[in-house]
Amino acid sequence: PNHARSWAKVMQAHGFSMTPEEAYMHEGRTGDDTINIISKREGRDVGTEERKKIYQEKTEVFNLCPVISPMEGSAELLHKVMEDGLFAMLVTGSGQPSLLERLNNDFPDSFIRERMITSFDVKMGKPNPEPYLTALEKGGLKPFETIVIENAPLGVEAAHTAGLFTIAVNTGPLPDSVLLDAGANILY
């Protein structure tokens, strides 16, 4: 919710129309892609410097949000994965150091940089499958060796398009059908 509220607040401050629900539909995209889509829809040209400013402001607003506790059971799941000799990879459309630091604080030793795919590692963000295909390559994995856990429709679509078994977890304001329609194999 913090992510979506931050995007909506900053985009509205810059004169764009965006609700938290719409922002959630863009979760997983790179910041540039999100800004470009909204600005084009509204017939505005946003240059590189303005995009950087908007994203920086969004990051600042996000960093002021209250810290949310990890989803119940997530730490235990990651621990079990590692205990069984497997490993987790993180695929995120974000490049915010503060978000990545929060993940490392909440899930110590679960995500190492070599197993993270961020906005800095790809040219095309979600819903393009590139982030997940990059994770497969970086992890030396085949599609049948993976299970994706995703909370955003664009992430579900990207994983599904990459041919990966996808469990959707509805953590937002959207109806379950949005995640299922995006290609989730299972909804939690």
Language model segments and positions:
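Short acidic-hydrophobic, aromatic-tinged amphipathic segments that line or gate anion-handling sites
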Residues: 186-188
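Short helix-capping segments at alpha-helix termini
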Residues: 13-16, 43-49, 107-112, 140
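Conserved SAM-binding loop
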Residues: 70, 88, 148-149, 168
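Structural loop-to-beta junction motif characteristic of Rossmann-like glycosyltransferase folds
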Residues: 163-165
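Active-site neighborhood of HAD-like aspartate-dependent phosphohydrolases
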Residues: 1-22, 83
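A metal-dependent, Asp-based hydrolase signature
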Residues: 27-62, 80
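Substrate-recognition "cap/lid" segment bordering the active-site pocket of phosphatases
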Residues: 95-147, 153-157, 161, 176-180
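Short, acidic loop-to-helix structural element flanking the phosphoryl-transfer center
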Residues: 63-90, 96-97
